[in-house]
Swiss-Prot record:
Keywords: Cytoplasm, NAD, Oxidoreductase. It is found in: Cytoplasm, Cytosol. This is 4-trimethylaminobutyraldehyde dehydrogenase A. The keyword Cytoplasm applies. Pfam families: Aldedh. It comes from Danio rerio.
Length: 508
């Protein structure tokens, strides 16, 4: 009897906060969900908004990882032989299905991740747009012709890598799975994807959608697990590439493991990004930009501009307005349309964020608003992982809250006087994922962008990420890129073919 996709099961038809319980197996390879072999290492997965158990995450062992990778390799042998146009048609169908089921996927994402439904729906839109974008690129993949003397010539072929591994993060579970799989599949690869153990659900929905759209069974597989499962994936001899999104310490381990068999690696790691607001800015836009740079997804965004440098002359007005609007942010049930901030991913993470705020106060910082555990009025949310959005003043560059990634709804505001000074301070970090500048001076805007040591610089906006635009970091924020046409280079390899049209000239 054929399996019902997760999205067609009754429990996913009318998701509301505190109601969803997932009992289906969440591994997927060979075109179907696969029951785990061993449940002894099962870990509970919690619904962030309520603190109740949503499902169990049962990690894959060595035999299961091997099965998933071999299934992917078999599918790769078929998929890579299709034309780009044939691959494109199937990917466009997957994008259409996601678009059609946007709301149901978004609700499942909210239950597992805790972000507001408003944001989750945008995430799902970005996912189908990404797949649609790379579906458009698939038929255009081509090489180059090089004319050589005597009528000889050479040409290049852009070829797939084989089986790629994607390791996702818990802040954008479905979107990251799409970001990694879409360019991989467009190039003719297969992918085995490991979601975060805290958000195991929606990547399986993507796998089922790809199957429904017509990809060969095994082309996009999902294995559940934590560090041990990730290690098995990185060490497997049939894996050609690993794309990882997550923390710097784990990224270093991924790179080390991949190096043993010289696998290609893309790393999208942490950040402590600067947002520089000059006194000549359009202040209203700068305030909105600062809020967008700090409070999306409860502050759990790697590229957030959490070090907000404000030119001293406008600091009082900026703080007054930012605090007023931060206090007005609606925190609560993430499935309610009016909610603008949901729950943090887990209780330990919530406690870590609150610990950063406590330490900031001990180091001289001043909490202008928020920074406390928030308990909504709704009784079912009393055990949720909510934190009121926080603005910190009196911050210094040497404070922990300014140097380390908090990954929560905490904005650290710092004054500055000159462009030269703020650039030096902004670049004084081991991270280099993103940056931003607000100014009306077009020359200054481009000068500052050129001098900021980061993979992305936003001018007069922040946290805008169209799928057409490459995204990735400098320094310890990683390397490689996601999105944009350049990502094709990270999921393919170039073969040079040299053709002699005359006789061989030999020295021997």
């Amino acid at each position: 009897m054929a399996q019902q996709p997760l999205l067609s099961l009754p429990e996913f038809q009318s998701v509301s906060t505190g109601t969803l319980v997932v009992k289906e197996p969440l591994n997927f390879w060979g075109g179907a969900r696969v029951k785990p072999r061993d449940t002894k290492n099962s870990e509970p997965v919690y619904e962030p908004a309520t603190g109740r158990v949503l499902c169990d995450m049962i990690p894959c062992g060595e035999e299961e990882v091997d099965q998933a990778i071999k299934s992917a390799h078999s599918a790769y042998l078929k998929w890579s032989q299709l034309s780009g146009m044939e691959r494109s048609r199937i990917m466009l169908e997957a994008a259409r299905i996601i678009r059609e089921r946007r709301n149901a996927i978004a609700k499942a994402e909210v239950a597992n991740n805790g972000k507001s439904i408003t944001e989750a729906e945008v995430d799902i839109d970005v996912a189908w747009q990404c797949i649609e974008y790379y579906a458009g690129i698939a038929p255009t993949l081509s090489g180059q012709h090089i004319q050589l003397p005597g009528g000889s010539f050479a040409y290049t072929r852009r070829e797939p890598l084989g089986v790629c591994v994607g390791i996702g993060a818990w802040n954008y579970p479905f979107q990251i799975a799409a970001w990694k799989s879409a360019p991989a599949l467009a190039c003719g690869n297969a992918m085995v994807f490991k979601p975060s153990p805290m958000t195991p659900v929606t990547a399986v929905m993507l796998a089922e959608i790809y199957k429904e759209a017509g990809v060969p069974d095994g082309l996009f597989n999902v294995v559940q697990g934590g560090a041990e499962t990730g290690s098995l994936l990185c060490h497997h001899p049939m894996v050609a590439k690993v794309s990882f999104t997550g923390s710097v310490p784990t990224g270093k381990k991924v790179m080390e493991m991949a190096a043993k068999s010289v696998k290609q690696v893309t790393l999208e790691l942490g950040g402590k990004s600067p947002l520089i607001i000059f006194k000549d800015c359009e202040l209203e836009n700068a305030i909105k930009g600062a809020l967008m740079a700090n409070f999306l997804t409860q502050g759990e965004v790697c590229c957030n501009g959490t070090r907000v440098f404000v030119q001293r002359e406008i600091m009082p007005k900026f703080l007054e307005e930012v605090v007023k609007r931060t206090k007005a942010i609606s925190v609560g049930d993430p499935l309610c349309e009016g909610t603008r901030m949901g729950a943090l991913i887990s209780k330990p993470h919530m406690e870590k964020v609150l610990g950063f705020i406590k330490q900031a106060k001990e180091q001289g910082g001043k909490v202008l608003c928020g920074g406390e555990r928030f308990v909504p009025n709704d009784p079912k949310l009393k055990d949720g992982y909510f934190v009121s959005p926080c603005v910190l003043d009196n911050c210094r560059d040497d404070m922990t809250c300014v140097k380390e990634e908090i990954f929560g709804p905490v904005m650290s505001v710092l004054p500055f006087d000159t462009e030269e000074e703020v650039l030096q301070r902004a670049n004084n970090t081991t991270f280099g994922l993103a940056s931003g500048v607000f100014t009306r001076d077009i020359a200054r805007a481009h000068r500052v962008a050129a001098n900021l040591q980061a993979g992305t610089c936003y001018i007069n906006n922040y946290n805008v990420g169209p799928v057409e635009v490459p995204f990735g970091g400098y320094k310890m924020s990683g390397f490689g890129r996601e999105n944009g046409t350049v990502t094709i280079e990270y999921y393919s390899q170039l073969k040079t073919v040299v053709v002699e049209m005359g006789d061989v000239e030999s020295l021997f």
